[in-house]
Each structure stands twice: as structure tokens, then as C-alpha cells.
């Protein structure tokens, strides 16, 4: 049931972002990368809280290391999008930062209550990001090696999230 809700919420959010950023690729990518870091920060926050409460599981250290690495990688993507003018407009920064604020706290609660479902949502988002970059490369700029590298990173993140879902059965 939660996976169905994840899919519907994701589809709705994607349709809004697609409409707002039609034809503005790097602004859209910047918003997506700004948002992409939020779940990993949320996961780390909850893992730290669980550790402080004595609720550490055997997978705890591995997950913390993976999520920290993912935040750094997503930050590199964000910086690339900034270098391409993705954050040039105040309205885009305003929209993304407010969306991140909401998304972060939703992920904190979601991860605390249902880590597998939280991972599933992030997994679906990473797959969407990979697909978004693949379409850009196919239809807009097939020679952008940085976008190609970012697309591969998104695929790797999706695989890591899938492994995390399996790990915490």
C-alpha cells in the first residue's frame, strides 16, 4: 500500500516540476539536486537518533556511511548545476528551498516509522532522476559527459537504496 502511495505522490510532484520547468533544463536539474540531498540527511538524522537511543542495528554503520557518501555525491551534482546557472533565479531558489524543508521533515518521520517505505520512495526518485538525465542526453545534449556521469551516479544510488531495503527486512 505504501509503495502505491509513494508512486502517486511522486507522479503528482513530477508533473508539477515538469510543468514549472519545461524548457529550463538546468534550473529543473538544480531543483531536483537540491531536493535529492534531503532524504539522505533525514536518514542520517534518524540513524543518529536511533543510535543515541540505543536502537542501533547491525546494518547501522554501513547505512550511515552510504548515506553520508550519497549526500556528498548529490552535493557535487548540485554544484555542477549551479555552475550551469541552475540557481540563477530567485524564484527557483525559493521554490526548491521550501520544498526541501517540507521534504526533509517528511522523510524524517517516514524513515522513523517505515524505513523500507522511505527507501522505496527515494529509490523511485533516483530511478526518475536517471531517466530524466537519460532523456536530456538523448534529446538535448548527447555530448555532456558531466550529465552522463551524474546519470550513472543516480543509477548507482538507486541500487544502493535497493540494497538498503533488502538489508532492513
Annotate each predicted stretch with a short phrase.
Residues 1-169:
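Non-heme di-metal
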